[in-house]
Design a protein with these regions (language model features):
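Short beta-strand/turn micro-motifs composed of small residues
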Residues: 2, 33, 55-57, 125, ...
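Rossmann-like dinucleotide/phosphate-binding beta-alpha-beta segment
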Residues: 112-149
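Rossmann-fold NAD(P)-dependent oxidoreductase module
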Residues: 14, 87, 91, 132, ...
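Short secondary-structure boundary/capping segments
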Residues: 23, 64-65, 112-114
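N-terminal glycine-/charge-rich "phosphate-binding" loop or analogous flexible N-terminal tail
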Residues: 1-30, 37
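Phosphate/diphosphate ligand-binding glycine-rich loop within oxidoreductases
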Residues: 30-104
Length: 149
């Protein structure tokens, strides 16, 4: 598990819970990359004995130059989608109802905001998050358009 960072304790616990052992990168047959913000460093940690590399999030674009056919590369695709979709829906509802203004207000006034019900919703990207948010929007009877490549 490299490089050293604030996620280490949680990742070590997950590896051990799954029956694995955490050892030095030079001894390991697998590498769990723990620093999504430092893709440029991964090459310096890769070793010939690594037959599997786990990347930290769904998108692999920052690591594209490091990918090879010598080892199995996996990522977090689908892991975060349900939680991100739920959070996105919460943010849309907060925005539509102007909750930030009401949270600071000291008195009730005429409501400002709009309904999500029946709204036209455009989703940019058709990946896992889009797939998970669409069912969450269905009860609101939205007209949904997904734009993808």
């Amino acid at each position: 598990m490299e490089p050293e960072n604030w996620r280490r304790d949680a990742l070590v616990a997950a590896v051990e819970l799954g029956g694995g052992t955490v050892c030095s990168s030079q001894e390991a047959s697998a590498l769990i990359w723990a620093a999504p913000e430092k893709p440029e460093l991964i090459q310096s940690y890769l070793s010939d004995n690594h037959d599997w590399v786990q990347l930290p999030f769904a998108g692999i674009e920052p690591f594209i130059d490091s990918l090879d056919r010598k080892r199995l590369w996996t990522c977090g695709k689908g892991v975060y989608s349900p939680a991100v979709a739920e959070h996105a829906l919460a943010m849309v509802l907060a925005m539509k109802r102007n909750l930030t203004a009401y949270a600071r207000s000291t008195q009730w006034d005429e409501g400002v905001g709009s309904n999500l019900f029946g709204a036209k919703v455009t989703i940019l990207g058709g990946g896992g998050i889009a797939e998970d948010i669409i069912p969450l929007l269905e009860p609101f009877k939205c007209e949904i358009t997904v734009i993808r490549k």
